[in-house]
């Protein structure tokens, strides 16, 4: 615990959109400068700050890390967007939009290039405090501009973060890097096996419309020269509890086996009671249609829940909330949720390398 994130008087509120003031505080803590900031006298030109956020804004203003919405307004209660927080973090990593390293308009694209932004830690449509935490963790494991040292190591070297407190996080980053290296070597051998469990809870206002879980296993044997001759097997069970208003007089509890199989350019689907299907399809189209192409061999650190090392290698459990798009749910649920957004979406994965 390096003290980067603090909750509100109502808890951590990870599903709440962050304000500009909250994001400013997070950035100062990320840099290990909270104690220094609290000693500053407020002289910044922004007149709309209430009090607690003044030290953080002053530090960022003094160090060229944050600007106001105008010459005299910071808009502390305004929502912090993914673009804004990415810009904050890029500046913390030593990149300067003022000096032309990137532009605010392309901050997300540049963040992706340097390994800061990914599909797991960042949501541009619904940016939450959860994303702030995930992106901040990723930033600590991202190389500082012009060096091969990650931000965490720089903060320790600068004395901004206690070396003892940072040790366990540094070890976690090292284990994650080792796992990803091993996973990439495994991918080069063309075979993959992955267990996962997708969970979804759908609400409309305060009414819960649907609960879903789908444990599954994916196995692939890639033909790296001719992808369409690759083999993929996907097996799982879809379990749903549905609000009667959606069931239209039908069952409100559903349990259904689902099995997909691909080989030699043919995609086979066994949807249980919904029928069996067979169609010609390329391997790339299968991956894109199921959003599996987003699951590469590497695991972003913000998704990892645990790493276990044993004599047979390493096992990582991780969560990929943003990977499976609504397209996959539409396919599984037959368009049942047209016009209704999924409130929470989890995919828990266990991978070995």
Residue ranges and their predicted role:
Residues 1-54, 63-83, 89-126, 139-177, ...:
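Feature responds to low-complexity, polar/acidic, surface-exposed segments characteristic
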Residues 24-26, 86, 312-318:
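Conserved long hydrophobic alpha-helices within structured protein cores
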Residues 60:
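Calponin-homology-like cytoskeleton-binding modules
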Residues 124-129, 346:
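Trp-centered recognition loops
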Residues 168-353:
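Subset-of-secretome marker
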């Amino acid at each position: 615990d390096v003290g980067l994130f603090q909750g509100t008087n109502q808890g951590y509120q990870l599903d709440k959109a962050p304000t500009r003031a909250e994001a400013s505080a997070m950035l100062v803590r990320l840099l290990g400068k909270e104690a220094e900031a609290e000693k500053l006298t407020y002289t910044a030109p922004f007149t709309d700050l209430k009090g607690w956020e003044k030290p953080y804004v002053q530090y960022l203003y003094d160090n060229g890390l944050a600007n106001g919405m105008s010459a005299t307004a910071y808009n502390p209660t305004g929502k912090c967007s993914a673009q804004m927080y990415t810009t904050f973090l890029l500046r913390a990593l030593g990149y300067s939009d003022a000096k032309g390293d990137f532009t605010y308009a392309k901050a997300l694209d540049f963040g992706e290039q340097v390994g800061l932004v990914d599909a797991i830690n960042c949501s541009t449509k619904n940016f939450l405090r959860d994303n702030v935490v995930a992106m901040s963790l990723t930033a600590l494991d991202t190389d500082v501009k012009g060096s091969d040292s990650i931000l965490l190591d720089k903060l320790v070297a600068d004395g901004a973060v206690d070396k003892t407190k940072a040790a366990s996080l540094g070890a976690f980053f090292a284990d994650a890097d080792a796992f990803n290296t091993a996973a990439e070597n495994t991918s080069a051998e063309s075979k993959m096996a992955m267990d996962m469990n997708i969970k979804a809870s759908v609400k409309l206002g305060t009414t819960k419309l649907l609960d879903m879980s789908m444990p599954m296993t994916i196995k692939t044997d890639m033909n790296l020269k001719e992808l369409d001759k690759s083999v993929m097997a996907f097996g799982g069970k879809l379990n749903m509890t549905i609000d009667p208003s959606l069931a239209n007089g039908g069952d409100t509890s559903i349990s259904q086996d689902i099995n997909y199989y691909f080989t030699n350019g043919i995609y086979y689907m066994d949807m249980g009671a919904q029928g069996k299907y067979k169609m010609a399809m390329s391997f790339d189209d299968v991956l894109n249609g199921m959003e599996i192409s987003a699951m590469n061999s590497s695991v972003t650190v913000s998704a990892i829940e645990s790493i276990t090392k044993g004599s047979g290698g390493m096992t990582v459990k991780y969560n990929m909330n943003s990977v499976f798009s609504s397209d996959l749910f539409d396919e599984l649920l037959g368009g049942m949720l047209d016009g209704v957004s999924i409130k929470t979406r989890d995919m828990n994965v266990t991978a070995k390398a």
